[in-house]
């Protein structure tokens, strides 16, 4: 267990999913947490209630990350509530899988506004507070920054931008005592991912999905939360500018798919199985 007692943490996009798991884990380890949401007030309130009921300190804040002004307001309000800031987790983001030629300018701009511009200006807004505490910025990216996936061109571009942003911001802020790191989760299925499939056995679906991952199981929001807590701790003080991949081994595989496997089999024989 890593002690976070007395630490003050802001986790963006923490009303549901990974962000919620990160916020709850920081709270379990003793941190006071500012929970942010853009439209999931119910989830954010539930996160806060769970923390407060366990004896912790938390409050929910709403901010639309499509604009910069609400980001700056969130920074001020969260820091005022917490009494300072030790850790910023830039987790808020949106995804989109859409054919390249059907992506609109509005969709493109929205993804980059929320996934790239928002973390940039959120970090900028809290630098004075993090400089006082010699704090940490954790940018949540994705394995889409490192591996291609069909119809994810825009989304993957935003995740790659976060990895590069993390590396460069780390160099800018290290002399001021602020450590910047990244965390790139693989697929972490949560119940909300299955809302378009009523009647499905969610636990079974998650178990089946886990069989496709080298680890043999799918990660959970708490898994990602525990890694985030580690990255924010003194134990990770020598990790600067790097983005840690946490995906159960997904990106270690070399997979060509059946269409590529056929000519490779013809060339090397039936015993050749790409990626094994």
Language-model features: locations:
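Conserved glycine-rich cofactor-binding loop
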Residues: 8, 15-17
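Substrate-binding pocket helix/loop in short-chain dehydrogenase/reductase
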Residues: 99-100, 104-112, 209
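Active-site loop immediately N-terminal to the catalytic Tyr-X3-Lys motif
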Residues: 101, 147-153, 175, 216, ...
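C-terminal helical subdomain
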Residues: 105, 182, 202-239, 246-248, ...
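Active-site helix of classical SDR
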Residues: 123, 158, 166
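Alpha-helical segment proximal to the catalytic Tyr-Lys
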Residues: 128, 171-175, 237
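Residue(s) in the substrate-gating loop at a strand-loop-helix junction
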Residues: 142
């Amino acid at each position: 267990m890593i002690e976070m007692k007395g630490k003050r943490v802001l986790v963006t996009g923490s009303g549901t999913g990974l962000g919620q798991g990160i916020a709850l884990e920081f709270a379990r380890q003793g941190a006071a947490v500012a929970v942010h949401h853009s439209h999931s007030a119910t989830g954010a309130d539930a996160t806060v209630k769970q923390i407060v009921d366990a004896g912790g300190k938390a409050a929910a804040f709403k901010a639309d990350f499509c604009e910069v002004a609400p980001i700056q307001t969130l920074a001020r309000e969260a820091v005022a509530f917490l009494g300072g800031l030790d850790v910023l987790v830039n987790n808020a983001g949106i995804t989109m899988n859409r054919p390249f030629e059907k992506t609109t300018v509005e969709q493109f701009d929205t993804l980059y506004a929320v996934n790239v511009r928002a973390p940039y200006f959120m970090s900028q807004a809290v630098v004075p507070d993090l400089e006082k505490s010699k704090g940490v910025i954790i940018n949540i990216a994705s394995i889409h920054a490192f591996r291609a996936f069909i119809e994810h061109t825009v989304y993957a571009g935003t995740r790659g931008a976060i990895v590069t942003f993390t590396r460069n911001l780390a160099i800018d802020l290290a002399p001021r005592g602020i450590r910047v790191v990244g965390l790139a989760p693989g697929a972490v299925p949560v119940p909300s991912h299955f809302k378009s499939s009523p009647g499905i056995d969610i636990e079974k679906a998650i178990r089946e999905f886990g069989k496709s991952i080298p680890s043999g199981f799918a990660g959970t929001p708490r898994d990602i939360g525990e890694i985030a807590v580690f990255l924010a701790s003194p134990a990770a003080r020598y990790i600067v500018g790097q983005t840690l991949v946490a995906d159960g081994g997904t990106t270690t595989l070399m997979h060509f798919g059946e269409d590529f496997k056929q000519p490779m089999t013809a060339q090397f024989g039936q015993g050749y199985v790409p990626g094994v």
